[in-house]
Design a protein with these regions (language model features):
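C-terminal interaction segment
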Residues: 3-65, 72-116
């Protein structure tokens, strides 16, 4: 299930709207309630002017909530920043990929993407 710019319920008072989320199926479960961190397989933010805000404000929230993997499409530097292994409010694994490199989501290893 893929949702674009839809709210994600992190807590009672936090509902950011990531640019894209890949969620556990079925789609019907999200008709009546917002997705929560447990539903997220992959979250993607696309950032140009919001790059610093996404890194400094959103990433710690996502890590604290246990979102397993976040991809930050860094348009300023033409990089894909891959954040994995959330622990203690931050991501322990960070990879920077150039456009020609391929990447596979941790929870969907059979999918290989060239991100550019």
């Amino acid at each position: 299930v893929v949702l674009v710019q839809s709210p994600l319920r992190l807590s009672e008072d936090s509902e950011p709207e990531p640019d894209l989320m890949v969620l556990k199926p079925p789609l019907d479960r999200y008709r009546e309630k917002l997705p929560t961190p447990e539903d997220v397989l992959l979250l993607v933010e696309v950032a140009d002017t919001s790059l610093e805000f996404d890194r400094e404000a959103k990433l710690p929230l996502y890590a604290e909530a246990g979102i397993p993997e976040v991809w930050l499409v860094n348009l300023k530097e033409n990089l894909l920043e891959v954040y994995r292994d959330p622990r203690g409010g931050r991501y322990r694994e960070i990879r920077l990929l150039s456009p020609e490199e391929e990447v596979s989501p941790t929870l969907l290893p059979e999918v290989s993407l060239r991100w550019a």
